[in-house]
């Protein structure tokens, strides 16, 4: 690959065709992440008949990369896309395992506020149900519920620097408003996440203790102490750091006596999230912090992430969330060059631990676990990003649907997408 990019070769060596359905890749160096889906080896293919006619420097801005045009691969081909609304799939007549049993699949974006009534009416066959509405949907009789731990989490992050495009790396600002680790830890200990999960999400969402999720059972440290609700400890941390209430108004000032106001941003989601955002503000006020909602309201999701990715200087703290994929390597999200390192926090210790996780030494299982535990403890101690809610995803499946499970399209699945079928022309109601 290197010789090809440097113009020393007109082809990429190390790619071997085994048969019509198998390709073997030869690497100069092996990394532990290669043992996992998505870890260092792309889980997608690029259609040569499309990209051969587009200059490489234009790939990133091309319609096929930006999603304006789509080429499908698998049991179904993409028939049409309505941006932000729906995707229609049709059976791939040439699928190597045989023609799918369904002629067409229509995926639509539906408001969480409407999905319960839509499923009750039989308007959709499969839907992920909003945890906050569990009481409203739990007794539906025309569906079967399947559940699995969702490999994703919500978090509170602190804006600690910027992404330097010219250098292609994150640069931490030692003078950032949230630079004091005691301030960050205090904001974590102020939150009663388990109570929020119970009251707002019916216990289907709950707190976690680490940025490595239980989903990664081989390296997750279940014994690590997380940021459990402890407002007294939060107050003590702030006192020790020099954030004190000097004028008796119940709110703490900066160490130099100036007014401390923290701007907090959150994306617009559902009613439960709106309640949670307001509760965050109240919990932080209880420990003496003046935290104000940036713009006075939550922000539409696309606009929110644009502000985060461009390091809006007016945002000090933000609540967001993401899926974790199948490779737990923290360098993917928190490394020096990781664009998704939205807190922009980098230090030598963290970088060194991540190098160990990505080293050949980590092929040793015991060493791998040791390195991951070390990074989890480091991340908790530095509190650049605090995990809040994880949970179980509940999927409602209409009773006419056959051969569906929560692990479909993964190696653990007993069902494959092309086998999915329905037993009647109309949905159960």
Predicted regions and their residues:
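Detector for C-terminal structural segments
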Residues: 93, 188-220, 272, 276-282, ...
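Append "and occasionally in soluble cytosolic enzymes with long acidic Gly/Pro-rich linkers
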Residues: 90, 177-282
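Surface-exposed binding/hinge segments that line
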Residues: 1-53
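A structural "hinge/loop" feature
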Residues: 34-45, 157, 166-171, 396-420
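Ligand/substrate-recognition segments at binding pockets and active sites
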Residues: 83, 244-321, 393
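Gly/Pro-rich hinge or "lid" segments in bacterial periplasmic/extracellular proteins
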Residues: 39-100, 104, 231, 236
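Ligand-site clamp/hinge motif
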Residues: 67, 91-137, 290
